[in-house]
């Protein structure tokens, strides 16, 4: 498999991109004394990355290559997951984020509070 194959197979390219993003998140979380894990419940609801810090705070992250449809899908998934969290037993997430492969600027969606962040913005 070469670069041309990946360009023509966005599904596989997306999996590679997700893996690289999770690797970067692990580096950043480790620098803060935190960790990163994956979440999936028995009904198939999942979150690509959950960043946990030692103080008990955590964030939910979906990784998407980009595009309005995929960003909307990722944000919807995060909102659904947050609604299933029993905040009597654990804290609500500190943030929800869709990490994308495109874009120059990060922003917060006013309708649901989900941050949309291009991967390049994490370094700053």
List the model feature ranges, each with a label.
Residues 1-124:
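A cross-kingdom feature that marks ATP-driven nucleic-acid transaction machinery
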């Amino acid at each position: 498999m070469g670069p041309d194959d990946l360009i023509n197979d966005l599904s596989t390219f997306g999996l590679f991109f997700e893996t690289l993003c999770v690797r970067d998140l692990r580096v950043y979380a480790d620098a803060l004394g935190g960790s990163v894990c994956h979440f999936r419940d028995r009904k198939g609801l999942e979150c690509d990355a959950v960043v946990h810090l030692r103080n008990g705070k955590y964030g939910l992250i979906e990784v998407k290559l980009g595009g309005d449809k995929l960003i909307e899908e990722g944000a919807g998934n995060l909102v659904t997951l947050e609604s299933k969290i029993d905040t009597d037993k654990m804290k609500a997430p500190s943030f929800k984020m869709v990490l994308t492969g495109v874009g120059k600027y990060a922003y917060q969606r006013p309708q649901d509070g989900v941050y949309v962040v291009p991967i390049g913005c994490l370094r700053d």
